[in-house]
Structures are given as structure tokens and as C-alpha cells.
Design a protein with these regions (language model features):
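Key DNA-contact positions within bacterial/archaeal DNA-binding proteins
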Residues: 40, 96
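C-terminal regulatory/oligomerization modules of transcriptional regulators
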Residues: 104-157
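N-terminal helix-turn-helix DNA-binding core of bacterial DNA-binding proteins
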Residues: 3-37
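Basic, amphipathic "hinge/linker" alpha-helix immediately C-terminal to the N-terminal HTH DNA-binding motif
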Residues: 61-80
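Glycine-centered, phosphate/nucleic-acid-interacting loop/turn motifs that mediate DNA/RNA or nucleotide
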Residues: 53
Length: 157
């Protein structure tokens, strides 16, 4: 999936997909509320999304993702979940922080980084022998380091 779309485009697609899932329809008013922008700003953005064939929208009508828009939304959801899983399951961050940071990070990583992240998560989850031990050790080291303990001291224990 080509993620060459800018961050703002990606964020609009995610909001529209969320609104479609929640309300079955996406409206300019609802998008403006979620983005914290004016309706006219949303209208300008929607015309750009329509030019990219990511949405179908008629003036004063509902906004609908096209097949390409749905593919992009699905891919963004997968990226978001992968980053959130890393932050929560591996690094042990609180869900609220992981959610907030995943929203930012998902737009910045390259396809190569995403692939490497997916391979890493798969490996960590599939290793029946080391999975729990690895995660415990990572979290233990993270806690020790946050207290100012150098890694060398942690490793010698």
C-alpha cells in the first residue's frame, strides 16, 4: 500500500472511516468537530481527497470512502495498532499514552520500518519459550534505567 499521502490526508481518512463505522455516515460537521477546524477548512480538504479519489462527496451530502480510501484507512488502522502494541505490550506504556503516541507515530514511519515492526512483533509473540521472559527483561531494564541505573549495572545482575 502506497502511503505517500501526507499526514493531514491520512488523518482525514481515519476520521471519515471512524465516523462511517460509528454512525454509518460521515458529515462535514462531524469531521470539523473531530479535527477542531471550521467546516470551510473541511470542505477544502474534502475537495482534495475527492481529487485523489479517496472519497466521494457531493455538496451538502454525506462523505463516503472510495475503495482506495477504504484500503488506505484499513492500512492506517493496522499501522496504528502495530505501534500501539509495541508501546503497550513490549514497552509497557499506559494505554492512553500509547494511543496518543501511536496516532502521531503511525504517520511518520516508512513502509520498511512498518515491515520490520511487524516482523519484530510476530517474532516476540510467536516465540513460546522466550516471549514472556523477553518482555519482562525489557520492562525491567526500562524501569531500572528510568531510575538512573546504567545498563551495564542492570546486565550484571
Amino acid at each position: 500500500m502506497n502511503l505517500s499521502h501526507d499526514t493531514v490526508t491520512q488523518e482525514y481518512i481515519e476520521i471519515i472511516a471512524d465516523l462511517e463505522n460509528e454512525n454509518k455516515v460521515a458529515r462535514v460537521k462531524d469531521i470539523a468537530e473531530r479535527r477542531g477546524v471550521t467546516r470551510s477548512s473541511v470542505s477544502i480538504a474534502l475537495s482534495q481527497l475527492a481529487k485523489k479519489d479517496l472519497i466521494a462527496h457531493e455538496a451538502y451530502g454525506h462523505i463516503v470512502l472510495t475503495a482506495e480510501g477504504r484500503r488506505l484507512a484499513h492500512h492506517l488502522t493496522l499501522r496504528h495498532q502495530a505501534v500501539k502494541d509495541l508501546l503497550m505490550d513490549i514497552l509497557g506504556l499506559d494505554e492512553a499514552i500509547a494511543e496518543q503516541d501511536a496516532c502521531k507515530f503511525e504517520h511518520l514511519i516508512s513502509a520498511e520500518t512498518y515491515s520490520a515492526l511487524m516482523r519484530f512483533l510476530y517474532l516476540v509473540r510467536q516465540c513460546p519459550k522466550k516471549h514472556g521472559q523477553f518482555i519482562r527483561e525489557v520492562r525491567e531494564c526500562a524501569r531500572a534505567y528510568s531510575d538512573g541505573t546504567p545498563c551495564v549495572e542492570c546486565m550484571l545482575k
